[in-house]
């Protein structure tokens, strides 16, 4: 059974590492959080001042 040279393992590691880093960075920068609507913010602010004691 033929064995791989160490440079091939290094090349595989580099290729998979670059692929993983690119995948993670694309996922990180493609995430766009949705901002809450102004009506929801007003309701939250009004309800937070409703003391029950």
Swiss-Prot record:
GO molecular function: proton transmembrane transporter activity
Membrane topology per record: Single-pass membrane protein
Key words, A-Z: ATP synthesis, CF(0), Hydrogen ion transport, Ion transport, Membrane, Mitochondrion, Transmembrane, Transmembrane helix, Transport
Protein's GO biological process: proton motive force-driven ATP synthesis
Regions that span the bilayer: 4-24
GO CC term, one of those recorded: mitochondrial membrane
Intracellular or extracellular location(s): Mitochondrion membrane
Subunit structure: F-type ATPases have 2 components, CF(1) - the catalytic core - and CF(0) - the membrane proton channel.
Protein family (similarity comment): Belongs to the ATPase protein 8 family.
Function recorded in the entry: Mitochondrial membrane ATP synthase (F(1)F(0) ATP synthase or Complex V) produces ATP from ADP in the presence of a proton gradient across the membrane which is generated by electron transport complexes of the respiratory chain. F-type ATPases consist of two structural domains, F(1) - containing the extramembraneous catalytic core and F(0) - containing the membrane proton channel, linked together by a central stalk and a peripheral stalk. During catalysis, ATP synthesis in the catalytic domain of F(1) is coupled via a rotary mechanism of the central stalk subunits to proton translocation.
The protein's name in its UniProt record: ATP synthase protein 8
């Amino acid at each position: 059974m033929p064995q791989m040279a160490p440079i091939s393992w290094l090349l595989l590691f580099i290729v998979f590492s670059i692929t993983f880093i690119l995948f993670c960075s694309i996922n990180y920068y493609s995430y766009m959080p949705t901002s809450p609507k102004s009506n929801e913010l007003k309701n939250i602010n009004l309800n937070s001042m409703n003391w029950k004691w």
